[in-house]
Amino acid sequence: MNGLHILGTGRALPANIVTNDDLALRVETSDEWIVSRTGIRERRFATHETLTQLAVEAARAALERAGVSPQELGLCLTATVSPDCATPSQACLIHQALHLPEDCPAFDLSAGCTGFLYAMETSAALLPRMARPYALLVGGELLSRITDMDDRSTCIIFGDGVGAAVVKADPDAPWFARLGARGCREVLWAPGPGQAEHPYLHMNGQEVFKFALETV
């Protein structure tokens, strides 16, 4: 399979910083407890920013660093489980905001924490067939939208932010990826549109950690 070169990256974060001490005012926890178990000291929670706004900011930074213009892109992929809307796809919203060419396909991948890896593998497979050799890959979440702030097991871990990369197909670049899946909603589950009776994500952190160590 063709490989990829990462030409430029970018990121964008909401302005609102939430510290461990902030969360300790709401749930039974402390800065020391969180840091000792996760290494996390703060996270960002969006108050007014949309995923599209953050994604466009990150994408523009990646394009600038890569020296690639939006009109040179042949593919636009977004990895997310918390898009601004179900349709149009998050990738299409980014496509519109950046005024990408109409022959530049854009679609989302929903694969949780592995989403960006899926996006890289997908772009490596598709780019040789696209009109231009560059792809914009965006990975981002606004997980504060679906996180129960009274659930200590999840609210201390998740936050909001976006990363982006501009990649180029390269048949000579070394490339190896081995993808798989193990679907289990008892371990990790996030709500879909209209699921008001279960509005928050659920995660069995110990099982996810075990799976990551043994398999990922």
Regions found by a protein language model. Give the residues of each.
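Short acidic, glycine/serine/threonine-rich loops at helix termini
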Residues: I17-V18, T87-S89, M120, T147-D151
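Acidic, glycine-rich active-site loops and adjacent beta-strand->loop/helix elements
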Residues: A12, A79-D84, A111-T114, G139-S144, ...
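Short, well-ordered, mixed-charge alpha-helical segments that flank or form enzyme active sites
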Residues: C85-T87, G115-Y118, L143-T147, G183-R185
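Phosphate/pyrophosphate-binding loops at sites that engage ATP/ADP/AMP, CoA/4′-phosphopantetheine
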Residues: A58-G74
